[in-house]
């Protein structure tokens, strides 16, 4: 079966930004104008098509990256609407990995926010070409040129306006297209009756000025056009279009558009720009991967090339497990067998679907450049490569950040224990930043994630999707332990209980290991003073103790243990006895090696009106924070700091009350650092009291 759209007329794009910039509303309008939906859904009414999870509709935020297909001007556009909340960074990360282009949405009032910078960095990591839509031009305080300036200064982007707003705030009536040098005047509330006319006389000078800036910027980035521009001082409309597209594809240029998705102004022009300026799958470099022999190879975006795809999301679904894939090359047919080259297992493709949010359409095949979902995969998880069984390749996987917060979870009734286990396994399959473990001392199930909201949503999903009611403990910080000194440790386990006894004796030297080395073991036993078969159990005893910690029950990291001596008994020694002796020696050594507690430090960025700067800095200092920098821009203060995660619980509420609801902040993991002695003593005594 032939393709519906040739590859050059396919666009795989993401819509990304910080919270409340209007991403989901922009997506809704795109679907409305392109005919996918016939009624406009509002985020604040809980009716958005892409916010299809119950929690998203209640909270008015986008949690998971919903994939939708639509068409415009005879082009297929596959859209991923990504979340703006930092707890759901993995959703943005996995979207960026599989997209060809991005619309970055900014609020015309708020401008560049901390989360905007995180999203921009993620797009940089995967070299994704992008354009900007400055949204909410109807809002009080909207300032298009101020936001444009912030994009240039803070994001270091070579941005250039290709539009100007006609009016602003309540007076927004239209948009000037600087490429065509025409004005688009909106005559009705739905944004469908548009009059294209000459630029209004009172804006002619402004439009001419910015059109010249556009021509100069394009000429500087395009050798073919610079001579023409220097000779005539003018570029044609088609020159401008070609120059913008070339600049975007080469990452030299970021076109900036404007409008108000909520007021239905400017969205059709955004769709035109997606078609005109963002890349098709064949415009981006072919995907790279590794062959079984370790050599690098590429897969061109071509239906005739060997099949390769990346699984970028796994999702539980009433009909079975949905695995979202980005097709990079070849054709994937339903009923076929493929190789999961990451895990070296074969998988069968039961069914294939393309999605329109929570609506789906079954298809017989997916082709190079498509975004779709597969049913029937049993062993494939996020970041795995699927490829032809006779032509294996492993594609670059996703960057997954480590979780920083954990809570204990237990079912409200004993009978729900099995349901809870199934729910946790299913959720961990979907979300690589969600981890599940069993606490060795208490036997409790502990879940870990990227933040309070992240875990709250997952617990909510356990109830809604898996019908498991759970009791949740208070959020706990993922502390670590390490040592700062060196020493010897000895463990002797000897027990006589009538008949055969138990005997194991281990002596070790302990010292700090290299950063991020975890646990390292070296065997220096010579002359058979401890038989070889008891070395491994002794190491295992040390390793298990290392994982459960010594001073406060947290994993011990970056430690090097060398087994130097010991003794055994011909009759009474056993593997279990040496495992216990190894654990005893490890604990003995740690206590003499100046053990310390480490805590996760978070990079916290706060934006507040200038009037609140003093109280916010004072509050961060009281949370053991280190203020690293501050700047003031047009009445808005930005404070950068490093703060222990333990001090940040409930900060969102505190910041709202300190700034009368006008402050925002972003937080992401930075590094581990020693906990101050007085704080560490309190944590240690609390943990010893609980054990």
From Swiss-Prot:
Catalyzes the GTP-dependent ribosomal translocation step during translation elongation. During this step, the ribosome changes from the pre-translocational (PRE) to the post-translocational (POST) state as the newly formed A-site-bound peptidyl-tRNA and P-site-bound deacylated tRNA move to the P and E sites, respectively. Catalyzes the coordinated movement of the two tRNA molecules, the mRNA and conformational changes in the ribosome. This is Elongation factor G. One of its GO terms (cellular component) is cytoplasm. Its main location: cytoplasm. It comes from Synechococcus sp. (strain CC9311). CDD domains: EF-G, EFG_III, EFG_mtEFG1_IV, EFG_mtEFG_C, EFG_mtEFG_II. It is found in: Cytoplasm. It comes from the Bacteria. GTP binds at residues 17-24, 81-85, 135-138. Residues 8-282 form the tr-type G domain. One of its GO terms (molecular function) is GTP binding. SMART domains: EFG_C (SM00838), EFG_IV (SM00889). InterPro entries: EFG_II, EFG_III, EFG_III/V, EFG_IV, EFG_V, EFG_V-like, EFTu-like_2, G_TR_CS. Coiled coil: none annotated. Belongs to the TRAFAC class translation factor GTPase superfamily. Classic translation factor GTPase family. EF-G/EF-2 subfamily. Keywords: Cytoplasm, Elongation factor, GTP-binding, Nucleotide-binding, Protein biosynthesis. Transmembrane segments: none annotated. PANTHER family: RIBOSOME-RELEASING FACTOR 2, MITOCHONDRIAL, TRANSLATION ELONGATION FACTOR G-RELATED. GO terms for biological process: ribosome disassembly.
């Amino acid at each position: 079966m032939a393709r519906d759209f040739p590859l050059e007329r396919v666009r795989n794009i993401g819509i990304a930004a910080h919270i409340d910039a209007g991403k989901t509303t922009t997506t809704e309008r795109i679907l409305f104008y392109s005919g996918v939906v016939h009624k406009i859904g509002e985020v604040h009414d809980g009716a958005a098509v892409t916010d299809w999870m119950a929690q998203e509709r209640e909270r008015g935020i986008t949690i998971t990256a919903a994939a939708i297909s639509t068409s415009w001007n005879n082009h297929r556009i596959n859209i991923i609407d990504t979340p703006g909340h930092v707890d759901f960074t993995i959703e943005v990360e996995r979207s960026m990995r599989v997209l060809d282009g991005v619309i970055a949405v900014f609020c015309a009032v708020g401008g560049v926010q901390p989360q905007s910078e995180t999203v921009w960095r993620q797009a940089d990591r995967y070299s994704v070409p992008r354009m900007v839509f400055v949204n909410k031009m109807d809002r009080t305080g909207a300032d298009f040129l101020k936001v444009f300036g912030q994009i240039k200064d803070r994001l270091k982007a070579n941005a250039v306006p290709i539009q100007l707003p006609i009016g602003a705030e309540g007076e927004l009536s239209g948009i000037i297209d600087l490429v065509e040098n025409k004005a688009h005047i909106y005559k009705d509330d739905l944004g469908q009756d548009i009059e294209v006319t000459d630029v209004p006389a009172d804006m002619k000078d402004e439009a001419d000025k910015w059109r010249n800036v556009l021509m100069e910027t394009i000429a500087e980035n395009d050798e073919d056009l610079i001579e023409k521009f220097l000779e005539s001082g003018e570029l044609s409309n088609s020159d401008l279009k070609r120059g913008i597209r070339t600049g975007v594809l080469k990452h030299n240029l970021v076109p900036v558009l404007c409008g108000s998705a909520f007021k239905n102004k400017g969205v059709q022009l955004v769709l035109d720009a997606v078609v005109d300026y963002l890349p098709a799958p064949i415009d981006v470099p072919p995907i790279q991967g590794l062959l079984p022999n370790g050599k690098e190879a590429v897969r061109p975006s071509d239906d005739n090339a060997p099949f390769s795809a990346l699984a970028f999301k796994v999702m539980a679904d009433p009909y079975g497990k949905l695995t979202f894939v980005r097709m990079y090359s070849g054709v994937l047919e339903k009923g076929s067998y493929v190789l999961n080259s990451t895990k070296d297992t074969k998988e069968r493709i039961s069914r294939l679907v393309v999605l329109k949010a929570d609506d789906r359409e079954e298809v017989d095949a997916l082709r190079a450049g498509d975004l779709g979902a597969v049913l029937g995969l049993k062993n494939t998880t996020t970041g795995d490569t699927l490829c032809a069984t006779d032509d294996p390749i492993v594609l670059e996987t996703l960057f997954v950040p480590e979780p920083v917060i954990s809570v204990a979870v237990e079912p409200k009734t004993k009978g729900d224990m099995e349901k809870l286990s199934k729910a946790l396994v299913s959720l961990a399959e979907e979300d690589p930043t969600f981890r599940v473990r069993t606490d060795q001392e208490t036997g409790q199930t502990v879940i870990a994630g990227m933040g309070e909201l992240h875990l709250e949503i997952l617990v909510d999903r356990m109830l809604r999707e898996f019908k498991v009611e759970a009791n949740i403990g208070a959020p706990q910080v993922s502390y670590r332990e390490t040592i700062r000194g060196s020493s010897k440790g000895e463990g002797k386990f000897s027990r006589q209980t009538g008949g055969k006894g138990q005997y194991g004796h281990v002596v070790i030297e302990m010292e700090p290991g290299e950063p991020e080395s975890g646990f390292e073991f070296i065997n220096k036993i010579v002359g058979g003073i401890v038989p070889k078969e008891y070395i491994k159990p002794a190491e295992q005893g040390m390793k298990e103790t290392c994982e459960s910690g010594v001073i406060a029950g947290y994993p011990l990291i970056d430690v090097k243990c060398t087994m130097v001596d010991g003794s055994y008994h011909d009759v009474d020694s056993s593997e279990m006895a040496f495992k216990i002796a190894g654990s005893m020696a490890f604990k003995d050594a740690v206590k003499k090696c100046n053990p310390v507690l480490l805590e996760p430090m978070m990079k916290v960025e706060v934006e507040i009106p200038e009037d609140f700067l003093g109280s916010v800095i004072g509050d961060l200092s009281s949370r053991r924070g280190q203020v690293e920098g501050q700047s003031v821009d047009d009445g808005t203060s930005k404070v950068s700091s490093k703060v222990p995660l333990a001090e940040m619980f409930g900060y969102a509420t505190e910041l709202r009350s300190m700034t009368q609801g006008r402050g925002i902040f972003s937080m992401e993991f930075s590094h581990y650092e020693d906990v101050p002695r007085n704080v560490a003593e309190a944590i240690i005594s609390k943990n010893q009291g609980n054990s």
